Amino acid sequence: MTLPAVSRSVRLSRHATHAALTAWQLAHVDEAAALLVSELVTNAVRHAEGIDVVTVNLHAGRTWLRIEVQDADRHWPQPRIPGRYDESGFGFILVDALASNWGVRETEAGKAVWAELDTRQESGPGI
């Protein structure tokens, strides 16, 4: 889905992600996926320069979900370690903690930042 590069697109991307995961019977990863899509879209909207839109793509395999956010800025994100009193800068720390894998790739128009979740459900204790 392509959205305007504005803050309200974060909420729209979360709702669309929830709808897709429900349809794909992946509701068990909805909370983590919502946080990841929120962080990735927020990063693009706040830090990508000269962009009008962001594109959010979701891809599901047998055991994984990939969330990818594309924008037209060719500059790759620079994760940093926030200071003790910083109120921002924690996005990629959260992405790293939630995702089984994440990265950045070049696209024709700019870049795509992606994060993957393991979608296998843990089985409960046996009887």
Indicate where each model-derived feature is located.
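Short amphipathic
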Residues: 1-5
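Conserved short strand/loop->alpha-helix "switch" segment adjacent to the catalytic nucleotide/phosphoryl-transfer site
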Residues: 14-38
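Conserved beta-strand-loop-beta-strand hairpin that lines the nucleotide-binding pocket
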Residues: 45-127
